[in-house]
């Protein structure tokens, strides 16, 4: 969907939309995900290429399966405010990639984009944000009186999810995987949680992270100026 793709670029990065507006207007509803990536690669703009790899025209919503858990709130959005079809997904980190692992087997042409989303949404120290959505990543804001407010900063399951995408892509088209290795088109998630130093971890191993409110405010200003790429 041309309009959905253009909307995706605008939300993620306003500057990229302004720079490549002429190219974006040439996209048609008949273009495939692969066509969009090829178009982006011709620009040799690494940020634009990253965005086009990240685009997946899915509609899906899921959080953790237990409805009694306090974080099990999510939207399944299928129509926009004009009652037109909406391509939108959201879910907790592991729920999204658990489902995409299975989806990649039935639709392997999306593997490059799924792998790109995984890599681009990890932090530099190997952790992950709380949620993945069509519009970008999200995290919990720490609330001193709410013990559930900062549960979403983990590195559990990281290796197995990545391994499965790599295995599937290697079997589907190993040439694509090899070419990815020297492409400078990936990013890190800039999550405002920080691991406490070693002495603090020893003092209280149940309280292992700090939330950087100043960093969070700075990121929010970047989002207003640039788009949700301000979280990277």
Q: What are the language-model segments listed below?
A:
Residues 1-232:
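Acidic, mature catalytic/reactive cores of soluble proteins
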């Amino acid at each position: 969907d041309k309009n959905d793709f253009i909307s995706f670029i605008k939300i993620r990065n306003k500057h990229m939309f302004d720079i490549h507006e002429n190219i974006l207007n040439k996209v048609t509803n008949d273009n495939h995900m692969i066509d969009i990536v090829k178009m982006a690669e011709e620009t040799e703009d690494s940020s634009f290429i990253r965005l086009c790899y990240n685009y997946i025209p899915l509609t899906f919503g899921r959080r953790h399966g237990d409805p009694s858990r306090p974080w099990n709130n999510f939207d399944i959005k299928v129509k926009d405010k004009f009652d037109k079809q909406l391509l939108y997904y959201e879910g907790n980190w592991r729920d999204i990639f658990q489902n995409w692992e299975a989806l990649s087997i039935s639709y392997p042409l999306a593997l490059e984009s799924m792998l790109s989303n995984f890599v681009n949404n990890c932090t530099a120290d190997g952790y992950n944000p709380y949620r993945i959505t069509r519009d970008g990543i999200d995290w919990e804001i720490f609330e001193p009186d709410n013990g559930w407010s900062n549960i979403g900063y983990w590195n559990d399951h990281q290796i197995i999810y990545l391994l499965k995408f790599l295995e599937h892509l290697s079997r589907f088209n190993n040439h694509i995987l090899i070419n990815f290795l020297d492409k400078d088109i990936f990013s890190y998630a800039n999550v405002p949680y920080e691991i406490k130093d070693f002495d603090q971890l020893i003092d209280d191993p149940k309280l292992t992270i700090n939330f950087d409110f100043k960093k969070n405010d700075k990121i929010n200003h970047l989002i207003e100026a640039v788009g949700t790429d301000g979280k990277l």
